[in-house]
Regions:
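N-terminal secretory signal peptides that target proteins for export/translocation
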Residues: 1-3
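Boundary/junction segments of secreted and surface-exposed precursor proteins
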Residues: 25-29
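Aromatic-lined, polymer-binding surfaces characteristic
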Residues: 51-147
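Sec-dependent N-terminal signal peptides
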Residues: 6-15
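Contiguous, function-dense segments enriched for cysteine-driven chemistry
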Residues: 41
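Boundary at the C-terminal end of the N-terminal hydrophobic targeting segment
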Residues: 19-24
Length: 147
């Protein structure tokens, strides 16, 4: 009987410890998120370029002038992520005419979905494992609360 109680107390303490650990880690993640958000929102944006890119974006979230299929050292699909980043910045940064336009958010999500679905390859491990994911995350972070 005493062993059962000790076991229950031990398990309760372990569970409590894990919960507080998870809460602390979540706080750390929020600190990192806020720092990244602050850094990205301090970047300059080209609103007129974002408007031009939006105007020629295809209904599937792609751009006609980008080659998503050819595997080359120069990764043409990189321009897709750079455009999405600029558009996401225009959407997220207060004080410009594209700030929080609902149709803009839909197009950003469409562009992210297209890139994820097509999954273009450069043939270069660095871009596949580091470059593209680090660029892909920027619109995701900027729209975190809305996705």
């Amino acid at each position: 009987m005493i062993m059962k109680r000790l076991l229950i107390i031990y398990l309760a303490l372990c569970f409590w410890g894990e919960c507080s650990y998870a809460v602390e880690k979540q706080k750390d993640i929020e600190i990192l998120y806020n720092r990244l958000l602050e850094e990205y929102l301090s970047d300059s944006i080209d609103v007129s370029q974002a408007e031009k890119d939006l105007a020629v974006m295809q209904t599937d979230g792609s751009w006609k002038d980008i080659d998503y299929k050819t595997v080359t050292f120069y990764f043409d699909a990189d321009r897709h992520l750079k455009r999405l980043r600029n558009i996401a910045l225009a959407y997220s940064k207060p004080g410009n005419k594209l700030f929080h336009k609902p149709e803009l958010r839909k197009k950003i999500v469409l562009g992210l979905d297209y890139f994820r679905t097509v999954n273009p390859d450069s043939g270069n491990w660095w871009y596949r494992d580091i470059g593209a994911p680090s660029q892909y995350m920027v619109p995701l972070l900027l729209l975190k609360t809305e996705l």
